[in-house]
Amino acid sequence: MISVPTGVRVWLATGHTDMRKGFASLSLQVQEVLRRDPLCGHLFCFRGRRGNLLKVIWHDGQGACLFTKRLERGRFLWPSPADDVVTISSAQLGYLLSGIDWRHPQETWRPTSVG
């Protein structure tokens, strides 16, 4: 995963988004629906209707980057549409992209002894 620079916020657009959208239409959605500046350097995440596809748009100061991830199994856990827009930490973004519940991450069990 590409590391998120310090001070960059990660925004989740609640609800579902048409995953056919590209740079221009996702940037417009950031402006009009989320009421944020798509050129500010923050990451904006969008999830498709089925929940297994995620797009992240980010302007790094030189140009726009569009990242896409599709889960082979399962769905990305997403906030309810009533929340409008949610901000998460870069660590929570790592959990989200791994398919882990970013709201309540739990340590996985590790054996303490052999045998």
Protein language model regions, located:
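Polybasic/polar functional segments that serve as interface/processing modules
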Residues: 1-115
